């Protein structure tokens, strides 16, 4: 019986790679064209599906050639081709099926399992879409892992005993990511992520294309943009030129018979110096600098704390990129691993771990933003803080906001702001059938669970009746890495203002709760209360109501402290008078949070 093989797949925006573990070592598989990377492009022509290199060559000439489909994963958008609409996961599935097919030919038997990588900032919807793409392609996706984690895994395979902090600089074809990880005893933990979802190697290619168009117009009096085939050749030559300039100081651009001019065929022969190229792309290099600083800040470490800097993505071969990294971090980046293949290698290693081929390696990823629920007053109460290691499950006891409330609404939010309205709403569901009781008595356990693939499940359970409701968060919209970083930055900028708002809301909720409690005591105790005590209670209630109207938080806090102390003395006296040791069930439960779930 053939040994189980789990494919390691880097499903990239621009290119994809597949690798396996062979004799306990990772091996990258070549496609039918003898290349180790395959363009993530699908084209349709005459009812025929074309994937990879051949499809890429049709990008400018065939309107039904589809690239960068990864950007649409997890959305409800579709692409039109072959006289029908395709969902993003259907197109991704065709790329995966192509990788699976040529992998099986290399291996010699069928393969049904895979580990697929995704950007660290991919949300639930994007991860689910990736799993679905694998399923459509005939693959059981054993694990979804973050790309920087995969890169660190590839790097750390033989160094599992050494503790180190690593920065992964990932400049892909269409996206840019920076991650800081901690490696220790075979464990890989993501400490932070940052980046730019709309920056990649393609932008450097486009700068060369723009330069070529301008030069060809000047020298040959010909506009290559007027000819789709000429533009396709220009883009191919631009990529080659970028690659050449990573290894040499000058590159010759040779494009014979690019088109027809006034005096016959246009034969282009131009030279581009590395110094010119670096000057025209300096602004792109600068755009990658800030995410490096941000990632270090989020991880709460200095550049001097880094043991290694890893490069991912073919564009990291550019000397200007390496020079900027070294200058920014005062450390030479590690160039010992192939930047095009490292992510797929890491995925293959994880596949080897799952198949039992490799041991002593443990992966720990983190959630990029805080997850919580909306509680009374619009407060965002966190359950799983940002950068919590996954998989994870966390629970908290909440209660009702109104007397005899039989239903609560659980609103799940994501973000760093202290008020729910300022964060992203992920989902909402109702828990019905709660036994009618005074506010604060029912115990509702809210649990958040994030699995190894980063998929979030939220449940709410009434501990007395056993009624339970559960949802899996599947976002209809996605968060780009820029949006994640923006949310973190906004939370930092608004921290003081948000804290004041939260303090005001919490004080108001506290006052309203005390008013409710005191009024209930007067009603329940009735004639048993000493008239003077009753008069004092009513006076205190009115004072609280007046301060609530006046919007004076500090004064309200002082009054609350005074009245709560008096109320406690009153409660003790009443208890002694009634000769009972019975106490407030809520007060005895140290696990019940002092914030009720908002009632819709």
From Swiss-Prot:
The modification Phosphothreonine is found at residue 175. Residues 583-600 have a biased composition (Basic and acidic residues). GO terms for molecular function: ATP binding; ATP-dependent protein folding chaperone; unfolded protein binding. SUPFAM superfamilies: Actin-like ATPase domain, Heat shock protein 70kD (HSP70), C-terminal subdomain, Heat shock protein 70kD (HSP70), peptide-binding domain. Keywords: ATP-binding, Chaperone, Nucleotide-binding, Phosphoprotein, Stress response. Induction: By stress conditions e.g. heat shock. PROSITE patterns: HSP70_1, HSP70_2, HSP70_3. It comes from the Bacteria. The keyword Protease does not apply. Residues 570-600 are annotated as: Disordered. NCBIfam families: PRK00290.1, prok_dnaK. Acts as a chaperone. Belongs to the heat shock protein 70 family. PANTHER family: HEAT SHOCK PROTEIN 70KDA. This is Chaperone protein DnaK. It comes from Mesomycoplasma hyopneumoniae (strain 232). The gene is dnaK.
């Amino acid at each position: 019986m053939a040994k189980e093989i789990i494919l390691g797949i880097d499903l990239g925006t621009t290119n994809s790679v597949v690798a396996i573990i062979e004799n306990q070592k990772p091996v990258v598989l070549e496609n039918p064209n003898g290349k180790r990377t395959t363009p993530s492009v699908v084209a349709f022509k005459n009812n025929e599906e074309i994937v990879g290199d051949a499809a890429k060559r049709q990008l400018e000439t065939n309107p039904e050639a589809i690239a960068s489909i990864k950007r649409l994963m997890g959305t409800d958008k579709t692409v039109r081709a072959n006289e029908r609409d395709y969902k993003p996961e259907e197109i991704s599935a065709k790329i995966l099926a192509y990788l699976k097919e040529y992998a099986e030919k290399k291996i010699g038997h069928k393969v049904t399992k895979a580990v697929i990588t995704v950007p660290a900032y991919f949300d639930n919807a994007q991860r689910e879409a990736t799993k679905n793409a694998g399923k459509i392609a005939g693959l059981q996706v054993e694990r979804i892992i973050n790309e920087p984690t995969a890169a660190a895994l590839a790097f750390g395979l033989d160094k599992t005993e050494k503790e180190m902090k690593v920065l992964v600089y990932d400049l892909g074809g269409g996206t840019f990511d920076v991650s800081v990880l901690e490696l220790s005893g075979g464990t890989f933990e993501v400490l932070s992520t940052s980046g730019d979802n709309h920056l990649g190697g393609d932008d450097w290619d486009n700068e060369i294309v723009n330069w070529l168009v301008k030069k060809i117009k000047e020298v040959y009096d010909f506009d290559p943009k007027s000819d789709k085939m000429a533009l396709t050749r220009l883009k191919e030559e631009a990529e080659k030129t970028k690659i050449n300039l990573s290894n040499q100081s000058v590159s010759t651009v040779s494009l014979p018979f690019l088109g027809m001019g006034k005096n016959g065929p246009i034969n282009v022969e131009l030279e581009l110096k590395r110094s010119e190229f670096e000057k025209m792309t300096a602004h792109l290099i600068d755009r990658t600098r800030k995410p490096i600083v941000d990632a270090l800040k989020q991880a709460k470490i200095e550049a001097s704390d880094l043991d290694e800097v890893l490069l991912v993505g073919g564009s990291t071969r550019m000397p200007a990129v390496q020079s900027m990294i070294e200058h920014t971090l005062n450390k030479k980046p590690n160039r010992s691993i192939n930047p095009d293949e490292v992510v797929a290698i890491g995925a293959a290693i994880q596949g080897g771990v799952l198949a039992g081929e490799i041991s002593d390696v443990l992966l720990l990823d983190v959630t990029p933003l805080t997850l919580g629920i909306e509680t009374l007053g619009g407060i965002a109460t966190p359950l799983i803080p940002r950068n919590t290691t996954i998989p994870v499950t966390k629970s908290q006891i909440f209660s009702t906001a109104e007397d005899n409330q039989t239903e609560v609404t659980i609103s799940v939010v994501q973000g760093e702001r202290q008020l729910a309205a300022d964060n992203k709403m992920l989902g909402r569901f109702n828990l019905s059938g709660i036994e009618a009781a005074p506010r604060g008595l029912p115990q509702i356990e809210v649990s958040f669970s994030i699995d190894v693939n980063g998929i979030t499940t939220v449940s709410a359970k009434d501990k007395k009746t056993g009624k339970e409701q559960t949802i899996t968060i599947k976002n209809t919209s996605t968060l780009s890495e820029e949006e994640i970083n923006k949310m973190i930055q906004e939370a930092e900028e608004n921290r003081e203002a948000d804290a004041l708002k939260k303090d005001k809301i919490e004080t108001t909720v506290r006052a309203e709760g005390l008013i409710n409690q005191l009024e209930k005591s007067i009603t329940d105790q009735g004639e048993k209360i000493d008239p003077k005590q009753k008069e004092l209670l009513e006076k205190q209630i009115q004072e609280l109501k007046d301060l609530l109207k006046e919007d004076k938080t500090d004064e309200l806090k002082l009054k609350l402290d005074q009245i709560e102390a008096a109320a406690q003395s009153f409660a003790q006296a009443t208890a002694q008078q009634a000769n009972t040791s019975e106490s407030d069930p809520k007060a005895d439960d140290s696990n019940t949070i002092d914030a009720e779930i908002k009632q819709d």
